[in-house]
Amino acid sequence: MNFNKLKFGATIGIIGGGQLGKMMAQSAQKMGYKVVVLDPSEDCPCRYVAHEFIQAKYDDEKALNQLGQKCDVITYEFENISAQQLKLLCEKYNIPQGYQAIQLLQDRLTEKETLKSAGTKVVPFISVKESTDIDKAIETLGYPFIVKTRFGGYDGKGQVLINNEKDLQEGFKLIETSECVAEKYLNIKKEVSLTVTRGNNNQITFFPLQENEHRNQILFKTIVPARIDKTAEAKEQVNKIIQSIHFIGTFTVEFFIDSNNQLYVNEIAPRPHNSGHYSIEACDYSQFDTHILAVTGQSLPNSIELLKPAVMMNLLGKDLDLLENEFNEHPEWHLHIYGKSGRKDSRKMGHMTVLTNDVNQTEQDMYAKFEGSN
């Protein structure tokens, strides 16, 4: 894949004005690019850092074409835009990320089948189209297993854990609303992720392996470098995925490590990812920098340098009062507040990163500060 480099001063369009779009825009602007963002929310975070804002729904064909006509290249911050709509845009405008990854990843079953065909190790799974397929799931996977909707769902939404026969009713309810995928429940020892950017002429740049902790299905914190030696194995798995999916830009592969120390691919995020936010302060290039370099046709750095180990923690609505009281006492906290208008207890409102020589102690300090609010 090779395409013309954008000159400085060119215009980048971003579909989606959330925090990822905002941080993309900030990276683009420091490189000399202009930014136009499209989002349905009049007060989305990216609006206030973009040069121009188009308020429209993501399926508004007229508005999407308006974005395309204004911009030299288009990127997107999430995978919830219609793959068919994106395909039509790709036929008319320069969208290096393409539509294939979105088309693939919007369907959990197709995603898992593709990952399996690519030779990566995935958790055993089966398709569940109707309630009678649950018997097959019990026979094939055994208890416990997880039922997930094929389409939609994020941060743990659209899934139920089936521990035993008593939980089956919840699974039946989910299947009544959507086709599903059942997958074996793993005894997870660690969750890790690997962020990678694919650029012009198939250039590949890896970030350090990231160790993640989730709470209530939402990312709570990320530690870099991961405290487990799985980098080489994770890179091997990601390279197999890269050969199977057409994509330009930054993306992240999430992994499970089970109690037997086996590494499994969980899912792919075809854009910059929450677990890579630490890179803004902790690396010589952030995941947003490399994404912008990739979609504008610029060369990527040969490698990413981790300047210092780091702990990144998400800040939810319920954390903000504590944060305001403590922030002045902690100059080591690199704070990012996204500027979202609606404050909810479980909504991601920002994140902070701490650079440290002792991630274990910093982790303990964060627990001591924020444990009571989580």
From Swiss-Prot:
* GO cellular component terms listed in the entry, alphabetical order: cytosol
The superkingdom listed in its UniProt entry is Bacteria
User: Can you cite a GO biological process for this protein?
Assistant: 'de novo' IMP biosynthetic process
Q: Does the keyword tRNA-binding apply?
A: no
One Pfam family of this protein, by short name? RS_preATP-grasp-like
Residues binding ATP are: 108, 148, 153-159, 183-186, 191, 214, 266-267
Keyword annotations for this protein, in alphabetical order, are: ATP-binding, Ligase, Nucleotide-binding, Purine biosynthesis
Return the EC number.
6.3.4.18
Q: Which GO terms describe its molecular function?
A: 5-(carboxyamino)imidazole ribonucleotide synthase activity; ATP binding; metal ion binding; phosphoribosylaminoimidazole carboxylase activity
Q: Where is the ATP-grasp domain?
A: 112-296
The similarity annotation says: Belongs to the PurK/PurT family.
Q: What does this protein do?
A: Catalyzes the ATP-dependent conversion of 5-aminoimidazole ribonucleotide (AIR) and HCO(3)(-) to N5-carboxyaminoimidazole ribonucleotide (N5-CAIR).
**What subunit structure does UniProt give?**
Homodimer.
What is this protein's record name?
N5-carboxyaminoimidazole ribonucleotide synthase
Source species: Staphylococcus aureus (strain N315)
